[in-house]
């Protein structure tokens, strides 16, 4: 058995500078390197099937697979950011070397190894979980709608009326997210989104603003100016 580096880097036990297990972290937890499978790069041939077909280690982290397919010329990398948008949203850019500064840590930015040996420098944001879980709650109440129907209701609602912080702790657990969104708006002195469309609009616009904020953080720490954002699926 082997462990592909991109998925290993999400464990927080990999040193992004060396691409190897961090002895400092392992020692702190009483672990040894031989507790883990040997590390390999994505694309490594690790064996063959009885039919002769090669067994190849792919990028085990789905976001790294998605970002590897990003249509970006080498000369445009420094001005390009990506947003892998699913239940979670991961917004970042590609670097040659990790950034391990205090500003980086305080901004909640992480260094994950990509499928091509580069660093995917990114921020984790709660994403379409807010839509998914709100839809489940409305269905539980007897109001079953498709995602397309929810989008249409959001489009029909008044814009730029109420906002939430998608990463606020009260939105992490399953349950009555529409009710929690209304309570957040009540607590922060904003208009309360009463209808389903208003709740959906609040979520979509809040995510858009959170993505903008993350891009500004990314730009401040890296010193880069981003002119292109590729939206991907992980």
Annotate each language-model stretch with its function:
Residues 1-2, 7, 12-28, 50-229:
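Active-site core segments that coordinate phosphate-bearing ligands/cofactors
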Residues 41-48, 226-234:
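Glycine-rich phosphate-binding loops at beta-strand->alpha-helix junctions
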């Amino acid at each position: 058995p082997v462990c592909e580096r991109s998925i290993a880097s999400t464990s927080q036990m990999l040193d992004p500078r060396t691409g190897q297990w961090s002895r400092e972290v392992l020692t702190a937890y009483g672990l040894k390197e031989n507790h883990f499978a040997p590390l390999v790069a994505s694309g490594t041939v690790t064996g063959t099937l009885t039919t002769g077909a090669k067994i190849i280690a792919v990028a085990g982290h789905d976001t790294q697979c998605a970002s590897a397919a990003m249509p970006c010329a080498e000369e445009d990398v420094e001005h390009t950011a990506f947003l892998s948008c699913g239940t979670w949203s991961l917004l970042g850019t590609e670097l040659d070397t990790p950034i391990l500064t205090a500003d980086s840590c305080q901004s909640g930015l992480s260094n994950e190894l990509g499928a091509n040996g580069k660093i995917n420098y990114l921020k984790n944001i709660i994403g379409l979980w807010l839509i998914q879980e709100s839809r489940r709650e409305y269905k539980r109440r007897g109001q079953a709608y498709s995602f397309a129907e929810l989008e249409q209701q959001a489009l029909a609602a008044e814009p730029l009326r109420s906002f939430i912080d998608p990463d606020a702790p009260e939105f992490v657990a399953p349950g009555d997210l529409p009710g929690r969104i209304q309570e957040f708006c009540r607590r922060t002195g904003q208009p309360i989104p009463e209808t389903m469309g208003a709740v959906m609009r609040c979520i979509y616009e809040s995510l858009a603003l959170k993505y903008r904020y993350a891009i500004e953080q990314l730009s401040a720490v890296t010193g880069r100016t981003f002119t292109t954002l590729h939206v991907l699926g992980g």
